[in-house]
């Protein structure tokens, strides 16, 4: 984490900022991204936004792999396989999440679902390359990580175009793997309703209880965060957040969106852990 902070500070200095500006990192990244979105050729260039985001991703990846290696003692290929399962699984269902979250998140972020070429291409390439490295260990999965990675790469190339028609095409490409999978396995889109099928997914009542508790606990936690920060509604939060950013008074530690995002990520991690506990995602399966 210290190395990551030093790298981010260095990148800020290299691009004309001060190291102390790291406390306003969100505002800086938002401004840089808005400037880049106005210039089509700038979207092709690797900039400060990409450098900092990749520093954060690599730091989190390093922590993940180190923790797994030290605590579990798995072989490196098993770690890569687990990483591919988690990454491709999230990428597979991301379009559905975009669809359900669109009415809410659109109020906070104009660029949603994310149509950034670097975002889509990098995730697609990582998923594809990692899947090729450990493909034999992924044969028992009921989805194909290579297929998911391929469509994300295709969506990345299409996202270079800013026309509204192409934005719709990007979403269709992202949801294509799930649509193709649902032809073979109708319960793929809503696997909770699945009892027996060729998808090799078994969800019993105990897991349904865990899932329900997880969803309600997450919603309660989000409501608690809004209450703690003194907001009565998401609309009020959105207006005050935008005003703070414009006035230069934005503080990421006091931003409920950051805390809500961490709650969602933690919930996703607990959901994956529930799958692993039931043996759906495990080193033995891989």
Swiss-Prot record:
Residue stretches spanning the membrane: 52-74, 79-101, 142-161, 168-190, 203-225, 257-276
Cell location: Cell membrane
A GO CC term attached to the entry: plasma membrane
Topology term for the membrane: Multi-pass membrane protein
Keyword annotations from UniProtKB, A to Z: Cell membrane, Membrane, Transmembrane, Transmembrane helix
Primary location group: membrane
Protein name: Uncharacterized protein AF_2133
Organism per entry: Archaeoglobus fulgidus (strain ATCC 49558 / DSM 4304 / JCM 9628 / NBRC 100126 / VC-16)
């Amino acid at each position: 984490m210290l190395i990551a902070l030093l790298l981010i500070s260095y990148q800020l200095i290299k691009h004309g900022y001060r190291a102390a500006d790291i406390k306003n990192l969100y505002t800086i990244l938002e401004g840089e991204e808005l400037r880049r979105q106005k210039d089509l050729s700038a979207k092709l260039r690797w900039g400060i936004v990409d450098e900092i985001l990749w520093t954060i991703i690599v730091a989190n990846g390093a922590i993940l792999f180190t923790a797994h290696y030290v605590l579990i003692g798995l072989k490196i290929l098993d770690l890569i396989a687990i990483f591919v399962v988690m990454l491709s699984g999230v990428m597979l269902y991301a379009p559905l999440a975009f669809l359900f979250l669109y009415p809410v998140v659109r109020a906070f972020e104009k660029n949603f679902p994310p149509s950034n070429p670097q975002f889509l291409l990098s995730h697609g390439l990582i998923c594809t390359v990692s899947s090729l490295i450990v493909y034999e260990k992924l044969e028992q999965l009921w989805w194909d990580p290579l297929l998911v990675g391929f469509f994300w790469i295709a969506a990345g190339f299409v996202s270079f175009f800013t026309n509204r028609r192409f934005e719709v095409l990007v979403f269709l490409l992202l949801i294509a793997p799930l649509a193709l999978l649902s032809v073979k396995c109708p319960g793929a889109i809503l696997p909770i309703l699945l009892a027996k099928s060729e998808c090799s997914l078994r969800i019993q009542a105990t897991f349904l209880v865990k899932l329900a508790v997880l969803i309600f606990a997450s919603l309660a936690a989000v409501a608690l965060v809004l209450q703690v920060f003194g907001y009565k509604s998401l609309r009020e939060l959105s207006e005050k957040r935008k005003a703070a950013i414009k006035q230069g008074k934005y503080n990421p530690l006091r931003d409920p969106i950051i805390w809500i995002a961490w709650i969602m990520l933690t919930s996703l991690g607990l959901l994956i852990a529930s799958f692993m506990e039931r043996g759906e995602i495990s080193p033995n399966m891989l």
